[in-house]
UniProtKB/Swiss-Prot annotation:
One of its GO terms (biological process) is arginine catabolic process to succinate. The active site is at E174, H248, C365 (nucleophile). Its EC number is 3.5.3.23. This is N-succinylarginine dihydrolase. Transmembrane segments: none annotated.
């Protein structure tokens, strides 16, 4: 059956700032306390979406979350009106304010893990929301992510959205950033590669930085998503690269159809894994980047593998990269050799995503891949699909509501909270989502 990969990109939120909240993510730590530009961040993301849509790649948008997220501050013991809660937390414990104001939901590669209908036992598209419990600021995302996915994929005959796994370390799940799908045409059954960093009883794990994904979580997600057990492989990420800042697998590998583009040191027991994939995926091609050409350190600083590998109708592929790759002589030299070599990659497309990159999120972090048949595509909420009208409307919306300068101190401004709620109210109407945000269901509560 014919099917297409649709990229659903996260729209950067109004409170995008640099707080260094993500231990193990070296870009996040390095840019801590710098001044951010939320308006520019949102526009950089929108331009990527529109450019790819114009090039013929189906593209949609997932809206930001409500931030600062006052309900969690109340759970932490801060009371009074919303303004009083903000004032108290800013004075008594500003680190909590930064956490509940994070714009991290923009990285929708961590929103959920997807199983296309060609891979599932019941023939539906399945989504399991990620619990993201390794980081407090990200663990706050699951409930609203679930509401948003249900508003976008609202046909229960075709889509099944599962709640996140229990919030315990044993079941740490980071979503599609640790998941690849390999195979022929998108509509054919594919091989799902779940990548984990640790498992109970296995001493092979990183020592410097946390392994956020567990094998136990990956196995549970595969069950929830009703993936045919014959179409699943579980593989461990190389713990040494996690300790070098590769906090998700999408920082060291990216797949599309029959191609796996990865670093030579991406996986534990890599040669064994690649042999398994060759045996089980028709026409499988591994493009392994040797450490002698691109080091793991250069991989992390340029986000070479946090790229998008997109298929054209003729079978050739475009590699979507952050600007940092072009600015690194060694990486850019390798990429031009790759273009000249015998493989499906025929074009490099570079985007300026500096605002997101400075927090450790490249092109792949910003998108959630969903393979859909024509019938399933028609069942998606049409208001989220990128086109000229939506692009212009979202740019106008960003111009109206987003600040061009934000520091950690600005997060205590009650006006920022009001601006954010008004903006999301307008956006949820624009995207025909209904009341997906807690403040909408509670009737506002600004006072």
């Amino acid at each position: 059956m014919n099917a297409w990969e649709v990229n659903f990109d996260g729209l950067v939120g109004l409170t995008h700032h640099y707080a260094g909240l993500s231990f193990g993510n070296e870009a996040s730590t390095r840019h801590r306390f710098q001044v951010s530009n939320p308006r520019q961040a949102a526009k950089q993301g929108l331009l990527k979406m529109k450019t790819l849509a114009d090039a013929g790649f189906p593209q949609a948008v997932i809206p930001p979350h409500e931030r600062p997220f006052i309900p969690v501050l109340r759970q932490l013991g801060f009371s009074g009106s919303d303004e009083q809660v903000l004032e108290k937390v800013a004075r008594q414990a500003p680190h909590w304010l930064s956490s509940v104001s994070s714009a991290s939901p923009m990285w929708v590669a961590n929103a959920a893990t997807i199983a296309p209908s060609a891979d599932t036992l019941d023939g539906k598209v399945h989504f399991t929301v990620a619990n993201l419990n390794n980081k407090f600021h990200r663990s706050l995302e699951a409930l609203v992510t679930e509401s948003l996915l249900k508003a976008i994929f609202n046909d229960e005959e075709k889509f099944s959205v599962h709640s996140a796994l229990p919030q315990v370390a044993l079941l740490g799940d980071e979503g599609a950033a640790n998941h690849n799908r390999l195979g022929g045409h998108y509509g054919e059954p594919g091989m799902q590669l779940f990548v984990y960093g640790r498992e109970e009883g296995n001493d092979t794990r990183p020592s410097r930085y946390p392994a956020r994904q567990t094998r136990e979580a990956s196995e549970a997600v595969a069950r929830l998503n009703q993936v045919n057990p014959q179409q699943v492989i579980f593989a461990q990420q190389n713990p040494d690269v996690i300790d070098q800042g590769v906090f998700h697998n999408d920082v060291i590998a990216v797949s599309n159809r029959q191609v796996l583009f990865c670093h030579q040191q991406a996986f534990a027991r890599q040669s064994q894994l690649l042999a398994n994939l060759r045996a089980r995926v028709n026409g499988f091609m591994a493009i392994e980047v040797p450490a002698t050409q691109v080091s793991v350190s250069d991989t992390v600083s340029t986000y070479l593998f946090n790229s998008q590998l997109l298929s054209r109708d003729d079978g050739s592929m475009m590699l979507v990269l952050p600007q940092e790759c072009r600015e690194h002589a060694g990486v850019w030299g390798y990429l031009n050799e790759l273009l000249a070599a015998d493989n499906p990659i025929s074009e490099l497309k570079v985007f300026d995503l500096r605002e997101s990159m400075a927090n450790g999120g490249g092109p792949a972090c910003l998108r959630l891949r969903v393979v859909l048949t024509e019938e399933e595509r028609r069942a998606v909420n049409p208001a989220v699909m990128m086109n000229d009208t939506l692009f212009n409307a979202l740019n106008d919306w960003v111009d109206r509501y987003y600040r061009d300068r934000l520091t950690a101190a600005d997060l205590a401004d009650p006006q920022l909270l009001r601006e954010g709620r008004e903006a999301l109210d307008v956006l949820s109407q624009l995207l025909n989502l209904g009341s997906v945000y807690p403040f909408q269901r509670e009737g506002g509560g600004n006072g």
